[in-house]
Each structure stands twice: as C-alpha cells, then as structure tokens.
Amino acid sequence: MDDYVIRREGKAVFYAPNPKKYDIYSAPVFYNPAMEKNRTLSVLLLKVAGAQMGGGLTVCEPLSGTGIRGIRYVIESGVVGKLILNDLSKEAVHVIQKNLSINGVEADVYNEDANVLLHKLRGQCDVVDVDPFGSPAPFLSAAFRALKNEGIVCATATDTAVLVGRYPRKCLRRYGSVIRKSPFYLEMGLRNLVGYVARIAASEDFAIRPLLSYWEGHYFRTCVYAVKSAKDADDMLQRDVGYVEYRRYRKVTRRQSEYTSGPVWIGELGDPSIAFFMAREGQYSDFLKLLEEEYSVSLPWFYKLPEFAVDGKSPTLEEAMAALRRAGVYAARTHMASDGFKAEATYGEVERVLRRVT
C-alpha cells in the first residue's frame, strides 16, 4: 500500500493517502489533515454530551472517508455502543476495514449512497455526523430521518463563501436565505448554517438546540441536540429563526427587507456548559473557553473596533472590554474576528461607552 501511509491522530493509528503522492483532492480516499481540530472537538463533544445521554450510543458517519472520525469516537469518547461507517467509494470501504482492524474497533461498514443508507437506518441512530466536502445540505433531511426520537446531528460546511452570501444566487438556491454585507458576516454565515439545519429539522418534526457551533478558517461546524416534537419545532421556528437588520446599528426583526440577512438562527449558537466541560478535557481549552464566554451573549452579532473609531483611532480590545464591563455591559471576545467582540448592548449603547475611551 505505497499509496498509503500510517498516521496518528488522537489515540488512533490509521492508513491515509500518502501526502507525497496525493493532495486531498486527488487522493483515492478522502482525508483532510487540516480537519484534525474538527475531529478532536467532535470527540470531546460526544464524550461530554454522550455521557449525559447515558452512553451506549449508535453513531453513524455516512461519509466516512478513511473512517478516522468514527474510529476516534469509539476509542476516545467511551460512549459509543454501535458504530456505523459508510462510503460510496469501494476503495474507501477497503481502507476503513483495514483501519478498524489495526485499531481493534468493530463497526457495521456499508458501501452505499449516504442518503440511501440514512433512509434505511430510519429511527435507529443516536448521533449522525454529516462531514462532507462542500455543503451538508443534500444530506440533512435523511440525517434527521435516521435519528431516534432524540439525538445529535452534526454538520460541517466548507462552502463558507456561499453561506456568508458572497454568491447570493447560490446562497438563496442552496440555503433559502439572503445574507447582506456586514462587519459580522462570518457570524451571519454560521447562523445561516444553523438556521438551515433548524428549518430542515422542523420539516421532519424535530426541534433543535445547538450544543456547539463555530467557524474555523475554511469551514463552519454545528452540532445540535434534536427532539422529535411538532409543537416544539413550531415554537423553535417562531422563537429562534428570524432576520438580522444591519444599517450600522443592528436589530432582530421578523420581516425581510433590503437591509436584512435571513432567515438565520437568532438563538444561542451553543451551550456554555457543554463548552465548559469540553474545555476541562484539556484539548483546545483556550478556544473552548472563548466559545463558552461567547455563547453567553444572546444578541446574534458581534461588533468590530474600527466601527467605533474617532479620528481614525479606536480603543484596544482590552480597553473596550474593560470599559463595557465597568458600564455594566456583559461583553466577550468573539472567535470570528481578532478585533471583534460581542456585547449585551445595542450599537448606540456600545458607542456611548467606547467614545469615552477613544
């Protein structure tokens, strides 16, 4: 297998395409080493949330590639009772079986179209992790159908330019939304993804509650806890899906206009307590502590320091945060911009505070 090399990730060893022969696009089996953080955070999430669910979970990864994500779930989370791996590529299935063997992990392995498999698994899974190259949109309806009456659905989206509205027609066509230009466009892109997941969930009579959502360089990622209830789905759509208006100031609205982005998720992007317990595991703890603080701000946008510049000068992030807190405003840094912060205050309220320190 000179086309493959042995790699290590987390507590697993596995065969992956030889990077000296292939890039990630030409490799016979898909594996992206740049997604290690994604996989590690997913393991931590399943370890924390899966324990709360009682363990012994049936976990399905319908787009498995080398199988490393699912294998790490079993080895490192301690909550997987049954693992289901799948890939449309026969070569990938062969590699998955070898990787299961060298790690001593058992799994049901399929060579199916992802949607076909998920439909066959209707109502059987506690966790479905959709991690495609590109958009998760084609797989989400089937993912929720494969779920039991409650469980977790995770989705990765690498089509970030579409989600942030850089390609308006494709955004509308693929996600049914319009995203306007704004200083906080990355948060709108993330909320666009979560909002789409929520609307698809509702179409299958599920209500969702985000556990972990974030942006990382070239992708957005969200993991949501879903409960089957038509009434709760109706309530969720009414409460947590809407529009964000931007005309320097920001506001949440239920009406679409030339100034609004949406429909997007306007509720919490994640559970602060989940991020807290994940951080205690020690891996990516600084990032997770940042998310914990960020999730505690309810307003669905962030501010950037240059918005409050006077004569071309703006306060440092530390000065701005300290001033807001002295004024009794809860504020937190955002992981989506080095000069950005979230605050439980309107643009005008933030402006009045920061003008005193510029």
Swiss-Prot record:
The catalytic activity of this protein is classed by the Enzyme Commission as: 2.1.1.216
Give residue ranges for domain Trm1 methyltransferase. Answer: 5-354
Q: What's an example Gene Ontology biological process for this entry?
A: tRNA N2-guanine methylation
Q: Which UniProt keywords apply?
A: Methyltransferase, RNA-binding, S-adenosyl-L-methionine, Transferase, tRNA processing, tRNA-binding
Q: Does the keyword RNA-binding apply?
A: yes
Q: Does the keyword RNA-binding apply?
A: yes
Q: Name one GO molecular function term.
A: tRNA binding
Q: Name one Pfam family in it.
A: TRM
**Superkingdom to which the source organism belongs:** Archaea
> What is the recorded function of this protein according to its Swiss-Prot or TrEMBL entry?
Dimethylates a single guanine residue at position 26 of a number of tRNAs using S-adenosyl-L-methionine as donor of the methyl groups.
| Gene that encodes it | trm1
UniProt-listed CDD domains: AdoMet_MTases (cd02440)
- Recorded protein name is tRNA (guanine(26)-N(2))-dimethyltransferase
Which InterPro entries did the record assign? Answer: SAM-dependent_MTases_sf (IPR029063), Trm1 (IPR002905), TRM1_arc_bac (IPR022923), tRNA_met_Trm1_C (IPR042296)
Positions contributing to S-adenosyl-L-methionine binding: R39, R69, D87, D113, A114
Report the sequence similarity comment from the record.
Belongs to the class I-like SAM-binding methyltransferase superfamily. Trm1 family.
* Catalytic reactions on record: guanosine(26) in tRNA + 2 S-adenosyl-L-methionine = N(2)-dimethylguanosine(26) in tRNA + 2 S-adenosyl-L-homocysteine + 2 H(+)
User: Which species is the source of this protein?
Assistant: Pyrobaculum calidifontis (strain DSM 21063 / JCM 11548 / VA1)
